[in-house]
């Protein structure tokens, strides 16, 4: 007499290992696609945010007949910092009127517009304010700590701490001007204490960059003297990025000096960029131990594809590859409002407003 056989259900060890292996292979095949889809969505979101910035500048220009200045502020000799940046000026056109009014109420101000004189210089349109982030007794002005999602690229992993001022991944173009781009004239659409007119962009709005992405980066920037900084290839040999007061004295809260680490601040290291070195390259500033130093500041992004989104004068947003033609980087940078051709190829030409370069749009 035979005992009835008892059937066993479930996987054997070998079968289980086979199933796990198959699942692992499927995950390996699908994960890159999922990650790519997420990055594509983030890049599209970034593109839309930049379109909003382009529209805000167009509406600002429609209201005041000029574009915002790179920075403006106090004319009080005891408080010489003109630090309010262009992003502050366009807040009302980004549906941020309450924040704009909060900033006005926190300090004694005039107004942010360029409506008072034909040349677009500061004149009576100045506002009186301390260095962003501090009051007269070195306290914090609360609105400077506000963070705006609109000014952050979704692909940037860095997040501000509560004690830091808000970051920005979007900056204004000062073209190929290096020396004194913090305080003097530039060959781009934006410069300090001057509200430029659309009509000045004789190269054509569709071929003139207004804004680009920048990387918020906390690494040390290289400090250079004039002779080194004036020739881009010399600064590009310095492989450190970011910004610091000095290698021996790193920044501490709340006055962080990192690239893009103050969206309210019009100093070049925070809210402007040059069209000299290709997107994603290094930045360098003048060795004057100040976060207001001029320098050669590059565009950059955290997108998987190498390059940056740029807002053009016609409101379009286009992706510029890091491999764009940058001309001859051994040549010194132009100065002032010189309207000669940029020595820095298509990238330099897209930043200038009236230098007469002919850039093939199909090459971008």
Q: Can you annotate each of these PLM segments?
A:
Residues 1-6:
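N-terminal secretory signal peptides that target proteins for export/translocation
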Residues 7-42, 46, 52:
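N-terminal single-pass transmembrane signal-anchor helix
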Residues 35-364:
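Internal low-complexity, small-residue/proline-rich segments
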